[in-house]
Design a protein with these regions (language model features):
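A conserved short beta-strand within the histidine kinase catalytic ATPase domain
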Residues: 60-69
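Short, low-complexity Ser/Thr-rich regulatory SLiMs
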Residues: 68-72, 128
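Glycine-rich/acidic phosphate-handling loop/turn and adjacent ATP-lid/helix
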Residues: 73-110
Length: 149
């Protein structure tokens, strides 16, 4: 079975638990070390945004699900879903479209997480609920030439 679920009181140090779940799925999908690090970074960033911005660093409940499925091409889909109970996020004023390149001279703290997540993951979804938010990020592991199914 390639599913993991976790209900936790979200705190900064809990990212280690989420990362271990991500690492198991990445290993099962036979991702390279670079891919594994990138997927882990994107999941860490979603989690950090919930803890920092949604919960203002207060320990509050959150659900996390990690799943791996095959698509119609035989590629692995790594699906990570977060359910928070923070104030509903209004994405209408977010510019999550085209990611603009940056350089060391223009990098400032904050504001790079969302573009980073969109760059790494193949799909990023947000769903507003009456009592919080749902976040889904999906990574597609493309089969390399010569690999079996």
């Amino acid at each position: 079975m390639n599913q993991f679920s976790l209900h936790l009181n979200a705190q900064c140090d809990c990212v280690l638990i989420l990362r271990s779940m991500v690492n198991v799925l990445c290993k099962r999908a036979k991702l390279s070390q670079i891919e594994k690090n990138r997927v882990g970074l994107a999941v860490d960033e979603v989690y950090a945004n919930i803890v920092r911005h949604g919960y203002q660093r207060q320990a509050k409940p959150m659900d996390f699900h990690a799943d791996m499925k095959k698509d119609d091409n035989g590629d692995d889909l790594l699906i990570f879903t977060f359910r928070d109970y923070a104030p509903v996020v209004n994405l209408s004023d977010w510019d999550c479209g085209e990611v603009k390149p940056c350089c060391a001279e223009t990098i400032v703290p904050h504001g790079l997480g969302i573009p980073l997540i969109h760059t790494i993951m193949d799909q990023v979804k947000h769903e507003a609920f009456d009592d919080g938010n749902g976040w889904t990020v999906i990574y597609r592991s493309k089969k390399k030439i010569g690999e079996g199914k």
